[in-house]
From Swiss-Prot:
GO terms for cellular component: cytoplasm. Pathway: Cofactor biosynthesis; (R)-pantothenate biosynthesis; (R)-pantoate from 3-methyl-2-oxobutanoate: step 1/2. 3-methyl-2-oxobutanoate binds at residues 43-44, 82, 110. The active site is at 179 (proton acceptor). It is found in: Cytoplasm. This is 3-methyl-2-oxobutanoate hydroxymethyltransferase. Belongs to the PanB family. Its EC number is 2.1.2.11. The lineage of its organism: Bacteria, Pseudomonadati, Pseudomonadota, Gammaproteobacteria, Moraxellales. Its cofactor is Mg(2+). The keyword Cell membrane does not apply. InterPro entries: Pantoate_hydroxy_MeTrfase (IPR003700), Pyrv/PenolPyrv_kinase-like_dom (IPR015813), Pyrv_kinase-like_dom_sf (IPR040442). It comes from Psychrobacter arcticus (strain DSM 17307 / VKM B-2377 / 273-4). It catalyses: 3-methyl-2-oxobutanoate + (6R)-5,10-methylene-5,6,7,8-tetrahydrofolate + H2O = 2-dehydropantoate + (6S)-5,6,7,8-tetrahydrofolate. Homodecamer; pentamer of dimers.
């Protein structure tokens, strides 16, 4: 079974690892067969499962339901689960909501933000709840950003993101996710912190990669993000199957053939 210790060893050894979003039992079993290292029950389910145009309407109960479905069905992957929008504004509610997700099978709780999360990260760590802090493009803040845009461009913004990463790691964060940031910045963050860093639209130099499952199967609604590759229709997926797409993703990340330059931002 993949644990945080496994991911830390991967980072130390320079071994890349994989993460995919998942929301139900059947796909969780397929990912176990493909040996996907980590699974994220993301609040992206608001868009790809519930049909909303953002992640904002997702509730803690929604997250708990889908986390339980996945955790029951995959005993090999490290399970990450999102705390959804406005569910961790105060420390008491953050702790209560984290407990709810951990009790149904999450191993790590993912939260979005920067150095303002330090107190929460420390409290959760002291309570035995590992956290993954999501930096860069944070979808729960889409209205603040004015849309889904690359973050961390320019010296000031890049330094702010790097400082935030160091701060939350010093506070006790066990993992980081970097979304839609310049590849060179993602590399700098990955080298600057001791914990594993997972990238999405953040270049090839992060320790791990994550994609939304529906996107990497060519099921994206609307415009396909630049950082996505369709592994289902890839000619190397000789089975032309979902299981084959998961296995090809796992292989491609491990061998370093994904992501390529066209999947990253400068």
């Amino acid at each position: 079974m993949t644990t945080l210790s496994t991911l830390n060893k991967f980072k130390k050894d320079g071994t890349k690892f994989t993460c995919l979003t998942c929301y139900d039992a059947m796909f969780a079993r397929m990912m176990e067969k493909a040996q996907i290292d980590t699974i994220l029950i993301g609040d992206s389910l608001g868009m790809v499962v519930q049909g909303h145009d953002s992640t904002l309407p997702v509730t803690v109960d929604d997250m708990a339901y889908h986390t339980a479905n996945v955790a029951r069905s995959n005993k090999q992957a490290l399970i990450l689960a999102d705390l959804p929008f406005m569910s961790y504004v105060t420390l008491p509610e953050a702790i209560a909501n984290s407990r709810k997700l951990m009790q149904v099978g999450a191993h790590v709780i993912k939260i979005e933000g920067g150095s303002e999360l330090c107190e929460l990260v420390t409290m959760l760590a002291q309570a035995g709840t590992p956290t993954c802090v999501h930096l860069g493009l944070t979808p729960q803040s889409v209205n603040v950003f004015g849309g889904y845009k690359v973050q961390g461009r320019g010296d000031e913004a890049g330094q702010k993101l790097l400082d935030d990463a160091k701060a939350v790691v010093n506070a006790g964060a066990a993992l980081l996710v970097l979304e839609c940031v310049p590849a060179e910045l993602a590399k700098a963050v990955t080298e600057a912190v001791a914990v594993p860093v997972i990238g999405i639209g953040a270049g090839a130099d992060t320790d791990g990669q994550v994609l939304v499952m529906h996107d990497m199967l060519g099921m994206a609604h609307g415009r396909t993000p630049r950082f996505v590759h369709d592994f289902l229709t890839d000619e190397r997926n000789t089975e032309h199957s979902i299981e084959g797409a998961f296995a090809l993703y796992q292989q491609s990340v491990k061998e370093g053939s994904f992501p390529k330059e066209q999947h990253q931002f400068s």
